[in-house]
Curated annotation (Swiss-Prot):
SUPFAM superfamilies: FKBP-like (SSF54534), GreA transcript cleavage protein, N-terminal domain (SSF46557). Necessary for efficient RNA polymerase transcription elongation past template-encoded arresting sites. The arresting sites in DNA have the property of trapping a certain fraction of elongating RNA polymerases that pass through, resulting in locked ternary complexes. Cleavage of the nascent transcript by cleavage factors such as GreA or GreB allows the resumption of elongation from the new 3'terminus. GreA releases sequences of 2 to 3 nucleotides. This is Transcription elongation factor GreA. InterPro entries: GreA/GreB_C_sf, TF_GreA/GreB_CS, Tscrpt_elong_fac_GreA, Tscrpt_elong_fac_GreA/B, Tscrpt_elong_fac_GreA/B_C, Tscrpt_elong_fac_GreA/B_fam, Tscrpt_elong_fac_GreA/B_N, Tscrpt_elong_fac_GreA/B_N_sf. The gene is greA.
Length: 159
C-alpha cells in the first residue's frame, strides 16, 4: 500500500468505506472474537482447526480495518457540484459510443478505490478512464485494449 497516496472518492464512495469500516469494527471484530473464544474452549490449541481459522480471519479483519482507516484518512472527496460538464473529470457520467460495435455505453469516472466495472464505474487510472479524462463531447478517443485499439465517441457528459 502506498503510504502517501491520496484516494479520490465521490461522497458515495467515501460513505461506503466509512460504513464498511464501522461494520468491521463494531460487528465483525466481535463475531471473530467470539469464534476464537469458542475455539479456545475446545482445548488443545496446537491441533485446533477452528482456532487457527478464527485467528486467520481475525488477522484479515484487522488488516482490512487498517487499510480502510488509511484510505479514509487520505481520502479526497470530489465535490460533484464543481464538476466541469464541458470535459470529462472524476465524478463525470459519460455516455460514449463504441464505434466498432455501434453500441452506446455509460461510464461513471471514479477513483481507483471505487471502481466497479460491473456497475459502470471505471477508474480514472484504467485505459478507458485515462483516455476520456479531459476530453469533451463529440470528441473521438482511441484506447489501447488487448485486442488492439478501441474508438469511442463521447456523446454526453453529466454528473
Amino acid at each position: 500500500m502506498e503510504e502517501n497516496k491520496e484516494f479520490l472518492l465521490t461522497q458515495e464512495g467515501y460513505d461506503k468505506l466509512e460504513e464498511e469500516l464501522e461494520n468491521l469494527k463494531v460487528v465483525k471484530r466481535k463475531e471473530v472474537a467470539e469464534r476464537i473464544k469458542v475455539a479456545i474452549s475446545f482445548g488443545d490449541l496446537s491441533e485446533n482447526a477452528e482456532y487457527d481459522e478464527a485467528k486467520k480471519e481475525q488477522a484479515q479483519v484487522e488488516e482490512r480495518i487498517l487499510k480502510l482507516e488509511n484510505m479514509v484518512r487520505k481520502a479526497v472527496i470530489i465535490d460533484e457540484s464543481k464538476i466541469d460538464l464541458n470535459v470529462v473529470t472524476i465524478g463525470s457520467i459519460v455516455k460514449v459510443k463504441d464505434l466498432e460495435f455501434d453500441e452506446e455505453v455509460e461510464y461513471t469516472i471514479v477513483g481507483s478505490t471505487e471502481a466497479d466495472p460491473y456497475d459502470g464505474k471505471i477508474s480514472n487510472e484504467s485505459p478507458v478512464g485515462k483516455a476520456l479524462l479531459g476530453r469533451a463531447a463529440k470528441e473521438v478517443v482511441e484506447v489501447q485494449v488487448p485486442d488492439g485499439v478501441a474508438k469511442f465517441e463521447i456523446l454526453e457528459i453529466r454528473r
